[in-house]
Design a protein with these regions (language model features):
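Conserved helicase motor core of SF1/SF2 NTP-dependent helicases
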Residues: 56, 60-63, 75, 79-85, ...
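Conserved helicase NTPase catalytic core signature
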Residues: 1-109, 118-123
Length: 318
């Protein structure tokens, strides 16, 4: 009988089976929560890919039907009326090549960007693709969306401990104005006082602006801020909104009818930049987004020229 990794993972939806396999690794509450989550999930997400890959590795390749290897194929590869006879060894070689085509490749060089966001299981998955490869790893712990960055870093060190390492530090920030980055630095240093932050060398003379409004007027205020910024920059205006507020804020932005206004969630903003940014409800970003203050730090560093925050409280301000 053949087992697919997807089916094996779904077996864990049975709490009794999960409890037996987990032994002392999970508490009864964790067993119930995990089993319930698996049973209630119709489709796997990107977060499950590393688990499925691990299971595929443990299960191994499907066995080959050796009976067919002993047969001769007298009619394969007809050319100019000549019958090509495939020997058993040739057939096995072709079967092995076909199997290898379905296996993860091993790469000579592996490049990992946003390395701070990889989980321990994802590091295991990636290193299987290049156990003897050279690596380029780019990351910033201050921007990690993983709940425990130290755990993820330890996993990376464990997986790549056999490799010689050369570290380089990014010392200059060219993206953000000095005014914007100074404020973002204040925010992240409340959580990571030892954060290794680069120096922003470009000044605009414009400080970030923070607007406090009534709770029911946040969406309207976000739209007003976007309109103002459209008049001040030639490029794009990013409006970064907690996912739960998108149904309220998105219609307001749609009424503006300007394609330069782009609404994204905090996690969607990673790796992006805008000429100006409106940050909606920073407190909600901290409380609702994986990574908390680190996620807010990412959001605050998306703007190259101007930054406006719109919030109903001042709790988040440094």
């Amino acid at each position: 009988m053949l087992f697919r990794s997807e089916a094996v993972l779904r077996w864990l939806g049975d709490p009794r089976r999960l409890q037996r396999w987990a032994r002392n690794e999970l508490t009864p509450r964790e067993v119930d929560a995990l089993a319930r989550a698996i049973r209630s999930t119709d489709e796997f997400t990107i977060a499950d890919v590393a688990l499925l890959d691990e299971l595929s590795t443990l299960l191994g390749r499907a066995p080959v039907n050796e009976a067919k290897d002993d047969e001769f194929d007298w009619m394969e590869g007809l050319s100019d009326g000549v019958n090509e006879v495939l020997t058993t060894s040739e057939r096995r070689a072709r079967a092995a090549a076909a199997r290898e085509a379905d296996e993860p490749e091993e790469y000579a060089h592996v490049l990992v960007d946003e390395a701070q966001d990889l989980s321990p299981m994802q590091w295991r998955m990636v290193t299987r693709r290049g156990p003897q490869a050279s690596w380029t790893i780019v990351g910033d712990p201050a921007q990690s969306s993983w709940p425990d960055p130290d755990e993820a870093r330890a996993a990376m060190d464990s997986m790549l401990s056999h490799l010689q390492r050369h570290s380089f530090r990014l010392s200059t920030n060219y993206r953000n104005s000095a005014e914007i980055y100074a404020f973002a630095g204040e925010v992240i240093r409340r959580t990571l006082p030892d954060a290794d932050l680069p120096n922003a060398v470009r000044s605009t003379g414009v400080d970030p602006e923070h607007r406090i409004v009534d709770d029911g007027k946040v969406a309207e205020a976000a739209g007003d801020a976007a309109v103002e910024l459209l008049q001040l920059v030639e490029g794009t205006v990013g409006v970064i909104v907690p996912p739960k507020l998108r149904p309220v804020v998105d219609p307001v932005l749609a009424e503006l009818g300007d394609p330069r206004v782009v609404a994204v969630s905090p996690l969607e903003s990673k790796g992006l930049e805008y000429d100006a940014v409106v940050v909606v409800e920073p407190d909600r970003i901290v409380s609702d987004t994986l990574g908390g203050v680190r996620a807010l730090y990412v959001v605050l560093t998306r703007a190259t020229q101007r930054l406006i925050t719109v919030n109903s409280t001042t709790n988040w301000l440094p």
